[in-house]
Amino acid sequence: MKTSTSILRACTFILLSAAALACRAETGVRVLNDDAHYPEGPIWYQGKLYYVEYDRNAVMTWDGKKNSVFSSDKGCGQSAVVPTVHGEFLTTCYDNGTIGRMAADGKVLPPYTHDKDGNKFTGPNDFAPDSRGGIYFTASGTPPDALDGKVFYIAADGSIALKAGDLHNANGIAVSKDGKILYVVETNENRLLKFRIGPDGSLSDRQLFVNLDDLTHHVVHIYPDGVKIDSRGEIYIGQSARETNVPLAGVIFIVNAVGVLLRQLTLPSLQVPNFAFSPDEKTLYVTAVDQIDKSPFLGKVYSIPNR
């Protein structure tokens, strides 16, 4: 997809130029946790940042001063956390194929193990709550190629139904502010899809929203990961670089509602898989990974000025 240079308000993608290299990191970056073990899936809720540490099998909180363990669930392999309308929390348990449940105090509750038709969840990954009290989530699919990714929907009454399949490593997911569009990342295809959301939560009219190869005009895939949408409808796309020398490592891409690149944010880490907004959206909380080749997948949690 072609972009206008007039709207690239941060760095342009002339990545080998001196100007681009000088723009490798944003100002005002703050480290909130410098010993995170594969941090992922954050959300701001009731005055705290909730996020997971996959390699610690833990849900963490940051209250503005310190990081604390909120809940642990050995074998889960948490990838994201989200509150429900019933005062519980859910986690995507990537390793054991369940949707973990926690009480408001962090106590582990019996998990969701399948949908209403008996479909299992292979590699649960990320959440997207809607305005009806329901929550969409992705199931990445069977490694290594993950060609059987899916999207499920947890209704407010706790029932779970399959809504979309045939996704190639389904990953980040987000609902548009008007509740009419669902965006889904296909990491292995380096693209972001969109679906029309029906009144009953059904998905239809599957379309390509943006191909990241076209967006970046670079030969190396960025492997898109998490996706979030702000109050202006701007779409933030994280990424998980799979090589250590990728020029676009640490970059969050921000596009408008038609997929045109607006700007980028750059963090001093290799992977920036996911993020969450502060209530006023002036701060972006970013989970990042520096050690991508082996456990404990050391990373950081950052805050960065937004806009």
Model-derived segments and spans:
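Blade-level signature of beta-propeller repeat domains, shared across WD40, Kelch, NHL, RCC1
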Residues: 276-307
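Short glycine/acidic-enriched loop and turn motifs that connect beta-strands
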Residues: 56-58, 96-97, 142-144, 189-191, ...
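A short beta-strand motif characteristic of beta-propeller blades
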Residues: 28-33, 66-72, 110-117, 159-165, ...
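Bacterial N-terminal signal peptides that target proteins for export
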Residues: 1-12
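Short loop/turn segments immediately following beta-strands, especially the blade-tip
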Residues: 195-202, 306-307
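Flexible "stalk/tail and boundary" regions
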Residues: 45-48, 62-64, 68, 85, ...
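A short loop-to-beta-strand structural motif that recurs across blades of beta-propeller domains
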Residues: 58-60, 98-100, 149-152, 191-193, ...
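Beta-rich, blade/repeat-based domains predominating
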Residues: 33-48, 54, 73-93, 98, ...
